[in-house]
A protein has these predicted regions:
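Conserved, well-structured ligand/cofactor-binding cores
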Residues: 1-175
Length: 175
């Protein structure tokens, strides 16, 4: 990969998405991978994953290769807000790298966990923005003493836009 490293938040989201997928038991990996991923997440050790690389339908191979590199004890990680050698951090935390077994390499790297993890973060922030926008819209409505019929139940129930109905309902509740 190239470019800037993913933020620790994004890297952790990738790890969580990967842990979720691998824990389903359909990827041909050993339980040691799941246990090490869990330990890294809990100890706040995140892999150095670069923002640019192959992301797409066949998987996030480049980014997940950087995660796999950490799992085998290679590459670099972020720990205590510092970029460090994985081997040093593993030694400090008494962690053992995984031993890759036959056919396990593909299971470690093939998937869409990068897109999924970053997508989850974006969805979270998008919802926060919607909430803020709704509150600001309500505040403006109050400040200018506008009519509130544009979000009335009578008007919005005639429209077949579920999202609009929900937002109008939330605005009525806020005011």
């Amino acid at each position: 990969g190239v470019g800037n490293p993913l933020s620790p938040q994004s890297a952790k989201a990738v790890m969580l998405a990967r842990l979720n997928t691998l824990s389903l038991g359909k990827s041909g990996i050993h339980p040691s991978v799941i246990f090490l991923l869990k330990e890294l997440i809990n100890k706040d050790v995140t892999p150095l994953i670069f923002e640019h690389g192959g992301v797409g339908a066949s998987g996030d191979l480049v980014q997940l290769a950087h995660l796999a590199l950490v799992l085998i004890g290679e590459g670099e990680v972020f720990y205590k807000n510092k970029r460090r050698n994985t081997k040093d951090v593993f030694a400090e935390l008494n962690l053992e790298p995984i031993k890759v077994h036959i056919r396990e390499g593909l299971g470690l790297m093939n998937g869409t966990s990068t897109m999924t993890g970053i997508g989850i973060i974006n969805a979270y922030y998008s919802r926060k923005l919607v909430d803020i926008s709704l509150k600001l819209s309500c505040a403006i409505n109050e400040i200018v003493k506008a009519y509130d019929d544009h979000f009335s139940e009578a008007l919005n129930s005639t429209k077949r836009h579920e999202g609009q109905q929900k937002m109008a309902s939330r605005m009525r509740e806020s005011l």
